[in-house]
A protein has these predicted regions:
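A short, flexible loop at the N-terminus of ABC-type nucleotide-binding domains that lies
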Residues: 1-20, 25-26, 31
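The feature captures the beta-strand-to-loop junction immediately N-terminal to the Walker
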Residues: 33-35
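Helix-to-loop junction immediately C-terminal to a conserved catalytic motif
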Residues: 48
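Conserved ABC transporter NBD signature motif
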Residues: 56-67, 71-72
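ABC-family P-loop ATPase nucleotide-binding domains
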Residues: 78-135
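Catalytic Walker B motif of ABC-type/P-loop ATPase nucleotide-binding domains
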Residues: 148-152
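ABC transporter nucleotide-binding domain
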Residues: 164-180, 184-243
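Conserved small/polar residues in nucleotide/adenosyl-binding loops
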Residues: 256-260
C-alpha cells in the first residue's frame, strides 16, 4: 500500500509544487493526470524517494519512503521521460543495475524485448528514441517492483507499440503491484487503468479507483465553465470539466474529457 499523508513540497524561491496531498493507493494501474506544471513529476519523485517532502509523509507499507531504506528502495522503480541508462547495451545495464532488485525477472525481460523486436546486445546510443524507450520500459516492467512509477511512458512510441505496451502491462501486473502512469494522453491507456490521480496547481483533486470515481465525480462538456468544477480545460471552444457528482446514479468515465 502506498500512502500520502498531507504531503507538501516547494522548490527553493518558488510556490508550493504540492499542497496537502493525501491518498491511499492500492494495487492496480493508476493514471496521474494534470497540465504541465501541475506537480505530476514532483509527486512521482516524492513517491520514488528522489525528493524529500517539506512536510507530511509518503509511506510504502507503513514506512516513510524519504528514509530511503534499502528494503523499500528495492520495491520502487521510477522511469523518467528520456531518462538516460548507463551502459552500452541493455545486457550491460542489467548486469550493473538489476542486482539491486531481488524481484527482477530475466525471462520476462527477454520476453518483452522479443515482443518489441529488440536485441538486448544492441547499443543503446544507436537506438531511435522510440526503441530506446521500449527497451527501458521492458527493463522497468521486468523488475516486478511493488511500485512502478512511469513518467510519460508512451512518449516516442508509435500506435502499435502503445497498444502492445498496454497488453504487456495487463498480462504481467500482479495484484500486489501498483503502477502509476503520468500521462497527457489518456487515449494511450484508456482500457487499462484501475484508478485516477488528478493534480491541478499542486492540489490532488481526485485520488480514487474507477468504482469510486463513478459515484463521486462526473465528466461534463459545456459552453460555459461549470461552477465549482474540480478541473476545467477549454478544448475547441467548449469547457471539458470534472465536477462533483451530486446525483444518485453512477456516471460513465469519459475518456475524451480526460484527455488533459
Amino acid at each position: 500500500m502506498l500512502e500520502l499523508r498531507r504531503l507538501k513540497f516547494a522548490y527553493r524561491k518558488g510556490a508550493e509544487a504540492l499542497t496537502n496531498a493525501s491518498a491511499s493507493i492500492g494495487g492496480g494501474v493508476y493514471l496521474l493526470l494534470g497540465e504541465n506544471g501541475a506537480g505530476k513529476t514532483t509527486l512521482l519523485h516524492l513517491m520514488a524517494g528522489l525528493l524529500y517532502p517539506g512536510s507530511g509523509e509518503c509511506l510504502l507499507n507503513g514506512d516513510p519512503i524519504a528514509a530511503r531504506r534499502p528494503s523499500d528502495m528495492q520495491r520502487i522503480f521510477f522511469l523518467g521521460d528520456n531518462m538516460p541508462f548507463p551502459g552500452r547495451t541493455i545486457d550491460e545495464f542489467v548486469k550493473m543495475h538489476a542486482q539491486f532488485f531481488p524481484t527482477f525477472d530475466p525471462q520476462l525481460l527477454a520476453d518483452i524485448l522479443g515482443r518489441f523486436g529488440i536485441n538486448p546486445a544492441e547499443r543503446l546510443d544507436g537506438m531511435s528514441l522510440g526503441t530506446r524507450k521500449k527497451a527501458q520500459l521492458a527493463y522497468a516492467l521486468s523488475l516486478r517492483t511493488q511500485v512502478l512509477l512511469l513518467d510519460e511512458p508512451a512518449n516516442g512510441l508509435d500506435i502499435s507499440s502503445k497498444k502492445l505496451l498496454q497488453e504487456i502491462i495487463v498480462e504481467n501486473i500482479t495484484e500486489e503491484q501498483t503502477i502509476i502512469v503520468s500521462t497527457h494522453t489518456v487515449w494511450d491507456f484508456k482500457n487499462l487503468f484501475d484508478g485516477l490521480l488528478v493534480l491541478n496547481h499542486g492540489q490532488l483533486l481526485v485520488a480514487s479507483t474507477v468504482d469510486e470515481i463513478l459515484v463521486r465525480i462526473a465528466f461534463v462538456s459545456a459552453s460555459e465553465p461549470p461552477v465549482g468544477a474540480l478541473y476545467i480545460e477549454r478544448v475547441a471552444g467548449r469547457f471539458n470539466a470534472i465536477v462533483k457528482n451530486d446525483g444518485d446514479t453512477d456516471t460513465a468515465v469519459s475518456y475524451t474529457h480526460l484527455t488533459l
